[in-house]
UniProtKB/Swiss-Prot annotation:
Catalytic activity: N-(5-phospho-beta-D-ribosyl)anthranilate + diphosphate = 5-phospho-alpha-D-ribose 1-diphosphate + anthranilate
EC number: 2.4.2.18
Pfam family, one: Glycos_trans_3N
One GO CC annotation: cytosol
Binding site for Mg(2+) 2: 225-226
Sequence positions that bind Mg(2+) 1: 92, 226
Organism: Ignicoccus hospitalis (strain KIN4/I / DSM 18386 / JCM 14125)
UniProt similarity note: Belongs to the anthranilate phosphoribosyltransferase family.
Name the UniProt record assigns to this protein: Anthranilate phosphoribosyltransferase
Length: 339
């Protein structure tokens, strides 16, 4: 790869093919170009807004470099880009645990916080989950419980070669977009939240090209990377090689809209843990937020109507099955529940 030539191409306003993006991501991750060039590429790609082919190429590279586990094609991952600055509790992870309690297979892939008060890994660790699961143990936990949480730094060791560049830049880069799509277990189903509306189309096309079975890419009002519990949510559905667009209202789930996101916000890991547990116990208003997101995931997996799925989620929470599943998952990981 000719780094200066490729950088000039981007600066001329041209974009990279998926093959060029793959080669670039590989060169960055393998330290084949220096830090100045790495920063130049990341900023240049960001300036023109990343394209589906570029995102696809970076994701393919990350997956090829990742520590192998699975694949678990029957599973779903629920993830988001982050960066919405809303500081809401970790609803996608709470929804993932609830899905497992309902019998759905889940492989959650996540990391510590970058922009929020607490990342999914921070919360899982605070709850007692053992993050340090090698592939063999992760497979065992998945087969035993139907759920496993994969701590991204363990499975993407090559990312350490760009970590300091990303930190020093202090801005979102294409790696922030590629992360939610780079689950090393390669689940066939995905619910992905994006922080900006323009990302909807980009993610949907990338997911289609990556060969996902079914997925939903969501952006909720007022600007969150989750299904909104207060208003409407834009959704791009991916069904193998087809992409469709819709807008769904919280009332379509059979839920009463929350008046505000304020009760869902957290300031630190302690609050994040408390609201996470309240959601799994079916307490208001956290359970509404969990419910609409879990229902959307169920719709992705089996096409069930979101109102029917929402009711099933609410009943699961009321029976205490989600909180019990969380204990089971933590114990299977070799951890000790802290609640």
């Amino acid at each position: 790869m000719n780094a200066p030539h490729l950088l000039e191409k981007i600066l001329r306003g041209e974009r990279l093919s998926s093959e060029e993006a793959y080669a670039l991501a590989m060169s960055i991750a393998k330290n084949e170009i220096d830090d100045v060039q790495k920063a130049g590429f990341l900023v240049a790609l960001r300036c023109g807004r990343e394209r589906p082919e570029e995102l696809e190429g970076f994701v393919r590279a990350l997956l090829d470099l990742a520590v192998k586990v699975g694949p678990f094609r029957e599973a779903i991952d629920t993830a988001g880009t982050g960066g919405d600055r809303a500081n809401l509790f970790n609803v996608s992870t709470a929804a993932a645990v609830t899905l497992a309690a309902m019998g759905y297979k889940v492989v959650k892939h996540g990391n510590r916080s970058v922009t929020s008060a607490a990342g999914s890994a921070d919360v899982m660790e605070a709850l007692g989950y053992n993050l340090n699961l090698p592939p063999e143990k992760a497979t065992e936990v998945f087969e035993r419980t139907g759920f496993v949480y994969l701590f991204a730094p363990l499975y993407h060791p090559a990312m350490k070669n760009v970590a300091h560049v990303r930190k020093n830049l202090g801005i979102r880069t294409i790696f922030n977009l590629a992360g939610p799509l780079s689950n090393p277990a390669r689940p066939g189903y995905q619910l992905v939240g994006v922080s900006e509306p323009w990302m909807l189309d980009v993610f949907a096309k990338a997911l289609k090209n990556l060969g996902v079975e079914r997925a939903a890419v969501v952006h909720g009002r007022p600007g969150i990377d989750e299904v909104s519990p207060t208003s409407t949510t834009e959704v791009y559905f991916v069904d193998r090689d087809k992409i469709s667009y819709s807008v769904i209202d919280v009332e379509d789930f059979g839920a009463k809209p929350l008046e505000s996101l304020e009760p869902l916000k957290v300031r630190d890991i302690k609050e994040a843990k408390e609201k996470f547990l309240r959601a799994l116990r079916g307490e208001f208003p956290e359970a509404v937020f969990l419910g609409v997101n879990a229902a959307m995931a169920i719709h992705v997996i089996d096409g069930k109507d979101v109102s029917e799925a929402y009711l099933e989620v609410v009943e699961t929470l009321a029976r205490g099955e989600a909180i019990n599943k969380l204990r089971e998952i933590i114990e299977a990981s070799g951890g000790n529940p802290t609640f």
